[in-house]
C-alpha cells in the first residue's frame, strides 16, 4: 500500500473511530466535523485517494458507504 499523507491518516483514523463507537461508517458531514475539514468536496477527494491507495472502498450513492478493505 502507498504511504498516507498526514490528513489521510487523520481521515482514516476518524472513520475507524466512528466504526468502533457506532458500528457503522460516518456520513460525509460527520466525517467533515470529526476531521476538521470544511467541505464535503475535500472529504470526497481524500476518500477517493484512500480508495486508490487500497485502504477503503466507497460505495457510491450509499449514505454510509465507506468500507475498509482487509489486506492481511
What are the residue ranges of the model-derived segments?
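Pre-recognition alpha-helix immediately N-terminal to the DNA-recognition helix
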Residues: 10-17
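Short, Lys/Arg-enriched anionic-surface-contact patches
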Residues: 1-10
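Short, cationic-aromatic polyanion-contact patches
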Residues: 5, 22, 61-72
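Alpha-helical DNA-recognition elements
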Residues: 17, 48-49
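Short helix-capping/hinge SLiMs at alpha-helix to coil transitions
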Residues: 17-23
Amino acid at each position: 500500500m502507498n504511504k498516507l499523507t498526514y490528513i489521510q491518516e487523520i481521515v482514516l483514523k476518524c472513520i475507524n473511530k466512528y466504526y468502533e463507537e457506532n458500528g457503522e461508517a460516518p456520513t460525509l458531514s460527520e466525517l467533515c466535523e470529526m476531521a476538521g475539514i470544511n467541505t464535503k468536496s475535500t472529504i470526497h477527494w481524500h476518500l477517493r485517494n484512500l480508495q486508490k491507495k487500497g485502504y477503503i472502498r466507497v460505495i457510491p450513492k450509499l449514505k454510509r458507504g465507506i468500507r475498509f478493505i482487509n489486506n492481511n
